[in-house]
């Protein structure tokens, strides 16, 4: 027997901690990505206690992250509207931060976890063209390469359905 059910799909951004204090229940998502950067560098550089992190990104690359509480609140508002049934909603930050800003803020979080670094060095594609990058060899490097697309992309997700159902696009907290 076929049921006439409409399913609503939410495609969320990379979730980070709460807006007010950055709290996260676990570190399996974005923060894990940050730990991989540090671990990779430490394994390659003799476990130096403090060093710069090197990351290859486009000059103005953005990262589609959003605070978990903002995304949940937005999904609740959307679900309260009858016209949301059967639609797909991209729950994404309408003004995503640049990678360099995000990494600087992330280093503070990692510092609270006992992972110390001394700043961040962002390399752009201009420099990448001049240098040769080796193929990832270690398991940590291979795992890190899985996340490289997130660091390099400048994707923007379409929030059109959110705007259509709510009549506006809620601002993400800064």
Feature roles, as predicted:
Residues 20-22, 101-102, 167:
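Short conserved micro-motifs at the rims of enzyme active sites and ligand-binding pockets
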Residues 39-55, 123-169:
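A hydrophobic C-terminal alpha-helical subdomain
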